[in-house]
UniProtKB/Swiss-Prot annotation:
This is Plasma protease C1 inhibitor. It is found in: Secreted. Residues 1-22 form the signal peptide. Belongs to the serpin family. The gene is Serping1. Residues 22-67, 85-141 are annotated as: Disordered. The record marks R470, S471 as: Reactive bond. Serine protease inhibitor, which acrs as a regulator of the classical complement pathway. Forms a proteolytically inactive stoichiometric complex with the C1r or C1s proteases. May also regulate blood coagulation, fibrinolysis and the generation of kinins. Very efficient inhibitor of FXIIa. Inhibits chymotrypsin and kallikrein. Keywords: Blood coagulation, Disulfide bond, Fibrinolysis, Glycoprotein, Hemostasis, Protease inhibitor, Secreted, Serine protease inhibitor, Signal. Disulfide bonds join C128-C432, C135-C210. GO terms for biological process: blood coagulation; complement activation, classical pathway; fibrinolysis; innate immune response; negative regulation of complement activation, lectin pathway. Interacts with MASP1. SMART domains: SERPIN (SM00093).
């Protein structure tokens, strides 16, 4: 029976609007975030030599990862105190005097100092560029390479942020592509410091004109991304954002109704339909004052290159200082590119899949060298070097044994974003390009992933006997390991995580 890997990912982001002091004439009153975003990695990512590829046998298609992402914006009824920030704004321009020629200046020494005493100056609105649905040909040519490098850097940063919020020696799975897609859609309507801080977190170049077009181009035969916007009737979304979102993300905004239960069913139904019903309930509840929901779903479909052995086997797996017996899947001819990495002190193996996708496993080599030691040594530079070396390595028929995997991972994303030193969702959110409402705040953000790797993906497959010499390469996975689902065409991780207990 051939094997199937089915990761599913959910991301829920709740945003609230603080209307306790909102000025109906104002468009934004955000202040500069005092925290500096962390530095970006600028390592270049080299091209791959795909001159060798093993023949692909006829194998029935299997189901692979599914990802869903949601942002929910609600009206904030907690009355957040922010009058101090608001009072620092200048008076409206209409209240400032315009001195006529020849009129003597006011005597500041004899009159109280007021706004009318100040010289007339043009008011400066917060920087809020309109969403760009077009980019130049010259920018488009280099945008995919920039995006793949940025996604790689972001994925490694995100891995460490997730790991820092998880308990030691626990399973973990997430989709960097899903989270980046969500944040990039937020970036489409971001202004001022929120825009620059998002660019920094995502490792994007400043004013990356073609990022949305490039992200749209990363949807291929094996990776499909779809988006949808839901909003309340009383939320005024800018036409420029609606048009750009339709052009770039293929979503026409849908209006929510007055019934929260009906809205909840509407949103969860959309998620289920766009994740092949792998994710049936993204939201457990929906606040009655919800004003905006942004959704993103990523669906992957791939198949193994070679069928696995139909017989079932149990084998030992090292878990928490003891050995446990877990179901294993095996193949005597699976195409694997592998090498030992001295920096990580780990064996790296790349399992070839269809649609230019691959499953990469990093497992410690020495018994005393644990997975946490591998994680500590992993940084964007090391990660890119590993992927480059894999690109130059040949896929050879290999005796492969690896466990059936079931991983469920749920994560509060606000804590992850704070580990990344991004605080705008909590303190200073500026979405002036999305709506004229200046008072939005994130109240919750959640990411959920389910990863399943089994042998039940294909009903029937042809078996063929092939004899190999004693020098057949071996790749065995019997210890906790790090994994990623790699898009070989666009060179970025779609899913990442670690497995301590294959049983889930």
């Amino acid at each position: 029976m051939a094997s199937r890997l089915t990761p599913l990912t959910l991301l829920l982001l709740l945003l609230a609007g603080d209307r306790a002091f909102s000025d109906p004439e104002a468009t934004s009153h955000s202040t500069q975030d005092p925290l500096e975003a962390q530095a970006k990695s600028r390592e270049s990512f080299p091209e791959r030599d795909d001159s060798w590829s093993p023949p692909e046998p006829t194998v029935l298609p299997s189901t692979w990862p599914t990802t869903s992402v949601a942002i929910t914006i609600t009206n904030d009824t907690m009355g957040k105190v922010a009058n101090e920030s608001f009072s620092q704004h200048s008076q409206p321009a209409a209240q400032l005097p315009t001195d006529s020629p020849g009129q003597p200046p006011l005597n500041s020494s004899s009159q109280p100092s007021t706004a009318s005493d100040l010289p007339t100056q043009a008011t400066t609105e917060p920087f809020c560029p309109e969403p760009l649905a077009q980019c130049s040909d010259s920018d488009r040519d280099s945008s995919e390479a920039k995006l793949s490098e940025a996604l790689t850097d972001f994925s490694v940063k995100l891995y460490h942020a997730f790991s820092a919020t998880k308990m030691a020696k626990t399973n973990m799975a997430f989709s960097p592509f899903s989270i980046a897609s969500l944040l990039t859609q937020v970036l489409l309507g971001a202004g001022d410091s929120t825009k620059s801080n998002l660019e920094s977190i995502l490792s994007y170049p400043k004013d990356f004109a073609c990022v949305h077009q490039a992200l749209k181009g990363f949807s291929s035969k094996g990776v499909t991304s779809v988006s949808q916007i839901f909003h309340s009737p009383d939320l005024a979304i800018r036409d420029t954002y609606v048009n750009a979102s339709q052009s770039l993300y293929g979503s026409s905004p849908r209006v929510l109704g007055p019934d929260s239960a009906a809205n909840l069913e509407l949103i969860n139904t959309w998620v289920a339909e766009n994740t092949n019903h792998k994710i049936r309930k993204l939201l457990d509840s929906l606040p009655s004052d919800t004003c905006l929901v942004l959704l993103n779903a990523v669906y992957l479909s791939a198949k193994w290159k070679i069928t696995f052995e139909p017989k079932k086997m149990m084998a030992p797996f090292f878990y928490k200082n003891s050995m446990i017996k877990v179901p294993m899947m095996s193949s005597v001819k699976y195409p694997v590119a592998q090498f030992d990495d001295h920096t990580l002190k780990a064996k790296v193996g790349q399992l070839q899949l269809s649609h230019n996708l691959s499953f990469v496993i990093v497992v410690p080599v020495f018994p005393k060298h644990q997975l946490k030691d591998v994680e500590k040594a992993l940084n964007p530079t090391v990660f890119k070097a590993i992927m480059k070396k894999l690109e130059l390595s040949k896929f050879l028929p290999t005796y492969l044994t690896m466990p059936h995997i079931k991983v469920k991972s749920s994560q509060d994303m606000l804590s992850v974003m704070e580990k990344l030193e991004f605080f705008d969702f909590t303190y200073d959110l500026n979405l002036c390009g999305l709506t004229e409402d200046p008072d939005l705040q994130v109240s919750a953000m959640k990411h959920e992933t389910v990863l399943e790797l089994t042998e039940s993906g294909v009903e029937a497959a042809a078996a063929s006997a092939i004899s190999f010499g004693r020098s057949l390469p071996i790749f065995e996975v019997q210890r906790p390991f790090l994994f990623l689902l790699w898009d070989q065409q666009h060179r970025f991780p779609v899913f990442m995580g670690r497995v301590y207990d294959p049983r889930g």
